[in-house]
């Protein structure tokens, strides 16, 4: 779900960019968010995902492989950040997601029986699940491609934001806005999936382009601090209090945080029964989440044999397509990445 602050973000705080804007910049991508996008977007006409001969889903690997190569061809230094163990207070949201997916599976089966291909595709996308096996396969593929990834101790967006704050990454990338609450100086949206996309439940297609939101510009436009932004998110609803506070929408929440300059006192004054957990605990989590400095960002030459083994021999990908893509990846590495690496202290803070 993530926190949805889109409604209160002024147009002047959102900058539409092209991929050239990110050339030679390190972008920390929320891996789970990207993989879910690949799982939902890369599907057959009837809504079923791509699969190999053993019935194993491969949409996530296809998206990860080809999209990563495309980004690297633009000289973008991609690093994927994977979620670790979620905090206990996320339990309600996790259970809600399970219920939504289970219901979507039932509706998908009903749509298939009725021959309603549009509905079947929609519900199939909603039912997409990312398994531990899929995540491990993604990590193995990234290793073979020479692309770095980081294992977060908890929330991937918190880790990506931390990396951006300390200068190891230029921006965090996700469809959700949580990384802004976690303090990322920049958020890039629409990076994993761009191009012409169909709007949900409509026969309308729009051109999706990357967006850049800078935290300082956003806070200045709203006239609030990051701490107030966190309080605003909690009022609306986050992964740790999915329902937010009854009767409070984004615009009302913004008025409240601006009227109460102290976000702690504002949260303390809210009815406790509105929250599944202490709102101050949620507030503190956004400001000081578990993160790690145990990572090294290094872009290596791809291991062609290993990539072939994973995709072609392991998952029935087209040998010719993989071979051609590997040539593109090798060229991108030679042109943009050879000798490029960043250690734990980011070149001693540059």
UniProtKB/Swiss-Prot annotation:
Cofactor note: Binds 2 magnesium ions per subunit. They probably participate in the reaction catalyzed by the enzyme. May bind an additional third magnesium ion after substrate binding.
Pfam families: XPG_I, XPG_N
One Gene Ontology term of the molecular function aspect: 5'-flap endonuclease activity
Annotated Mg(2+) 2 binding sites: 176, 178, 239
E.C. number(s) listed in UniProt: 3.1.-.-
InterPro entries with a match to the protein in the record: 5-3_exonuclease_C_sf (IPR036279), Flap_endonuc (IPR023426), Flap_endonuc_arc (IPR019973), HhH2 (IPR008918), PIN-like_dom_sf (IPR029060), XPG-I_dom (IPR006086), XPG/Rad2 (IPR006084), XPG_DNA_repair_N (IPR006085)
HAMAP family per UniProt: Fen
NCBIfam families in UniProt: fen_arch (TIGR03674)
Protein name: Flap endonuclease 1
Species per Swiss-Prot/TrEMBL record: Hyperthermus butylicus (strain DSM 5456 / JCM 9403 / PLM1-5)
Gene name per UniProt: fen
């Amino acid at each position: 779900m993530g926190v949805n602050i889109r409604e209160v973000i002024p147009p002047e705080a959102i900058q539409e960019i092209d991929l050239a804007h990110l050339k030679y910049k390190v972008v920390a991508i929320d891996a789970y968010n990207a993989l879910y996008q690949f799982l939902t977007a890369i599907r057959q006409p009837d809504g079923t995902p791509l699969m190999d001969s053993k019935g194993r889903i491969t949409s996530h690997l296809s998206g990860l492989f080809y999209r990563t190569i495309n980004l690297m061809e633009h000289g973008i230094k991609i690093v994927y950040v994977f979620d670790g163990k979620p905090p206990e207070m996320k339990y309600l949201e996790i259970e809600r997601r399970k219920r939504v997916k289970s219901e979507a599976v039932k509706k998908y089966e009903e749509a298939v029986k009725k021959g309603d291909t549009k509905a079947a595709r929609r519900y199939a996308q909603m039912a997409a699940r990312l398994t531990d096996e899929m995540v491990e396969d993604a990590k193995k593929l990234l290793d073979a491609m020479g692309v770095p990834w980081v294992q977060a101790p908890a929330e991937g967006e918190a880790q990506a934001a931390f990396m951006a704050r300390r200068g190891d990454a230029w921006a965090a990338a996700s469809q959700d806005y949580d990384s802004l609450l976690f303090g990322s100086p920049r958020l890039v949206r629409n990076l994993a999936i761009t191009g012409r996309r169909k709007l949900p439940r409509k026969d309308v297609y729009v051109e999706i382009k990357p967006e850049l939101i800078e935290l300082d510009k956003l806070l200045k436009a709203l006239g609030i601090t990051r701490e107030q932004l966190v309080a605003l998110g909690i009022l609306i609803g986050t992964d740790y209090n999915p329902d937010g506070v009854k009767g409070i929408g984004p615009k009302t929440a913004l008025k409240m945080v601006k009227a109460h300059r102290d976000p702690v006192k504002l949260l303390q004054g809210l009815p406790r029964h509105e929250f599944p957990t202490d709102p101050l605990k949620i507030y503190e989590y956004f400001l000081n989440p578990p993160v790690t400095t145990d990572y090294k960002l290094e872009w290596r030459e791809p291991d062609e044999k290993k990539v072939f083994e994973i995709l072609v021999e392991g998952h029935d990908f087209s040998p010719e397509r993989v071979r051609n893509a590997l040539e593109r990846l090798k060229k991108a590495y030679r042109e943009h990445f050879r000798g490029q690496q960043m250690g734990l202290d980011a070149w001693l803070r540059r």
